[in-house]
Structures are given as C-alpha cells and as structure tokens.
C-alpha cells in the first residue's frame, strides 16, 4: 500500500483513491507493480506533473515579470505543448530541437509553433525597452543566451557579454557567437482561440482571488 501511495504521488502528483489502493492490494497476479506504473505513465496527469520541472527550469510564467508583471495572454500554448510532449514520451534530443528551432528543423509541422515559446518563456523587462542605454534587442538576445546556457549547459553566460567569464569557461567570443545564433529571432504574440471553458475558469479564479485581495487590502490599511 505504501508503494502505491508513493509511486502515485511521484508520477502524477496526486494521492491514489481508496478504490485504487484496494485494487492494488487485492491484485495477486505477477506484475502488479509494473501494471500500476504503466497506468500512471499513461495518465494525462503524468505530463502535468513532470512538465512542471521543465517549466520551472526555463522560468516559464503566465506574465512578463519585472515590476510591471503584465500578463501573457497566449503563453499557455507553450505550457500545453510541454505537457503533451511529456505525455507522448518524445525523445529529449527532438524535444530540444523543437524548442530551439522548430520552424527550421520541422518546417512541415506548423503545429509545433508553440514549442518556440521556449525562447520567450522567461522574464521580459518591458521598462528596459524604453530606458535601456543599449539597443533592447541585445538585452533580449542576452536573455535567450542565458536561457539556453542555464538550461542545457547548467552555467551562466551573461558575465561574458562584457568580459571573459571569471569562473566558467565562457569567453566573450563564445558569448557573442551565441548571440549571433539568436540575432534573427524577434519576439511577438501569436493569437490563439480561447480554450473551451476558459471564461468559466477565469471567473472561478477571480472568485477564489477576491478574499485574498480583501485580506491584503485590510493588512495594507493597518
């Protein structure tokens, strides 16, 4: 029973139901453990659970971040793409290629366009667009370079924008070579049809948020 609880929490992030625990305990046939794992891996909840780790790694958010933190109305297709990819057990090498350059590697697959959301999933400082002392495109590509390096090489690279990295083997020449890779990338919004039930979901979220907003307002007034 302990195994059933732990493996269910690990793979889909939810506890097993009472019926699932009873079914496992009463399953005396060989391969009971394997059947449980196979069913959990086939569950759509598996992708929802494990996609979170990738989305956290690349700093995905439904808003731009920074002080304005404006919403990204059409960020969700990339999130759904990652979930679906985990559920389909897509090989890692292909998963990476789809996110970095789906339009180049798979030009006959327009349905992979949401994968390119990887390049704009992180923080986007809108105020710097108007106030940066250098062309904003350079700062934007700097984010892409750091995103790629931290995700795939587990190291930072932004120091090398001005000088060779003091701790990691990233010289300035390598940094600007990576910037050149992303020089042709221009961020923009792609409009998607709203998902079924989105309005109802947002209404429910607003209902849940209202008490929190009230408490925050009362605390600030004290």
Task: State where each predicted segment sits.
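Short, structured secondary-structure elements
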Residues: 3-202
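Short, small-residue-biased leader/transition segments that mark boundaries at the very start
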Residues: 1-2, 163, 204-210, 214-216
């Amino acid at each position: 029973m302990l195994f059933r609880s732990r493996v269910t929490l690990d793979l889909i992030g939810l506890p097993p139901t009472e019926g699932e625990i009873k079914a496992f305990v009463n399953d005396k046939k060989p391969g009971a453990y394997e059947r449980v794992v196979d069913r959990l891996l086939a569950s759509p909840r598996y992708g929802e659970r494990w996609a979170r780790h990738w989305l956290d790694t690349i700093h995905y958010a439904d808003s731009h971040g920074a002080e304005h933190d404006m919403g990204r109305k059409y960020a969700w297709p990339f999130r759904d793409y990652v979930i679906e990819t985990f559920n389909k057990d897509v090989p890692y090498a292909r998963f990476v290629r789809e996110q970095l350059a789906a339009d180049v590697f798979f030009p006959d697959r327009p349905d992979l366009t949401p994968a390119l959301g990887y390049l704009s999933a992180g923080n986007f400082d809108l105020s710097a667009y108007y106030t940066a002392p250098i062309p904003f495109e350079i700062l934007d590509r700097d984010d892409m370079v750091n995103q790629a390096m931290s995700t795939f090489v587990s190291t930072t690279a932004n120091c090398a924008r001005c000088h060779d990295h003091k701790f990691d083997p990233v010289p300035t020449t390598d940094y600007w070579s990576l910037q050149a890779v992303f020089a042709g990338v221009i961020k923009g919004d792609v409009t998607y049809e709203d998902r079924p039930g989105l309005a109802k979901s947002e209404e429910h979220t607003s209902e849940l948020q209202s008490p929190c907003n009230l408490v925050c307002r009362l605390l600030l007034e004290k």
